[in-house]
Structures are given as structure tokens and as C-alpha cells.
């Protein structure tokens, strides 16, 4: 995916074979909370995409080396629930299919995406299709995860 160079908000589907492979998994709650709180403070406690205030999520963003099947952790973003759920719209679909979330959530997210990016429903649907096409291809591979400068050892040095 082009990391949304022409859009402020774009979908980032993590390949199924990488689910739960993230920094949060290897850190203690205290260590993760330190990172999360720092990310929120640097963003002035606002969503870094749409500017909303209120509850935030610390989103890990990744870069993918498709040739060598390596996912690289590149950093973090403070995101509101709507922007974060668009990033992980596949998870939203799972929650809806299980009956945990109402279908209306998807409609609300589409409206949020269109508003933030100033695009129509057709562009939203095209973006969703492209994101899932990339996800399907990437999910066929077994990926290595590279936490880079955010690995547990280097993170502990900066936290304590």
C-alpha cells in the first residue's frame, strides 16, 4: 500500500500471519503504558489524523518488505477510535460478523473516512478493496517481525 500519500486516513491491514506479533505483546503493561502516554502527549492528546480529542489509541504502524517477508515497526500514532478502527477495518468486520458490534459501525466509519479524506463512497469502496487485495496476498506468507529501535531491550533502556 502507498501508506496513503494522497489521503490523511487509510487502511492498514496487518497480514493474518502477523496477527498479535507486535511490541505491545513483548512489553509489560507498565512499559507499554509509558510508550502510549508519551505518544499521546507528543500529539497534544488529539488524534494525529483528524484532530479529535477524547479517548485515544496508540497505533503501531508498520512497513512491509514484500520481497523478503519482513514487517518493520516504524513508529506510533495517537488515534481516535474512528481513525484506529479504519486502520483495522478487518477487525471491525470480524466483530460485526460475530454480532459483537452492530453493522452501523461500518457505515459510521465509512462516513468518517470520507469526511477526513474529502472523498466519496466510490473512493472509499475502492480503497477498501485495494487494502483487502494487498492483505490477502501478504497473508499467504510467513512474515518475520523486526521491532527495530523499539525492541524490548532498547525500550527498557529509554523507559527506566
Can you describe what each PLM-predicted range is?
Residues 36, 40, 46-78, 87-98:
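Histidine-centered nuclease catalytic patch
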Residues 81-83:
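DNA major-groove recognition helix of helix-turn-helix/homeodomain DNA-binding modules
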Residues 1-35, 52-54, 99-160:
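A boundary/linker detector
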Residues 13, 44-45:
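Hydrophobic alpha-helical segments, principally membrane-spanning helices and signal/leader peptides
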Amino acid at each position: 500500500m502507498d501508506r496513503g500519500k494522497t489521503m490523511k486516513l487509510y487502511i492498514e491491514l496487518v497480514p493474518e500471519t502477523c496477527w498479535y506479533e507486535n511490541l505491545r505483546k513483548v512489553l509489560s503493561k507498565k512499559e507499554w503504558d509509558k510508550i502510549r502516554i508519551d505518544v499521546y502527549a507528543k500529539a497534544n492528546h488529539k488524534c494525529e489524523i483528524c484532530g479529535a480529542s477524547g479517548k485515544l489509541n496508540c497505533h503501531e504502524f508498520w512497513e512491509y518488505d514484500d520481497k523478503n517477508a519482513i514487517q518493520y515497526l516504524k513508529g506510533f500514532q495517537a488515534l481516535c477510535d474512528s481513525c484506529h478502527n479504519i486502520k483495522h477495518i478487518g477487525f471491525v468486520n470480524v466483530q460485526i460478523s460475530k454480532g459483537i458490534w452492530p453493522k452501523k459501525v461500518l457505515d459510521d466509519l465509512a462516513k468518517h473516512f470520507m469526511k477526513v479524506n474529502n472523498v466519496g463512497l466510490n473512493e472509499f469502496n475502492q480503497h477498501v478493496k485495494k487494502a483487502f487485495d494487498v492483505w490477502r496476498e501478504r497473508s499467504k506468507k510467513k512474515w518475520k517481525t523486526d521491532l527495530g529501535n523499539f525492541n524490548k531491550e532498547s525500550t527498557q533502556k529509554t523507559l527506566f
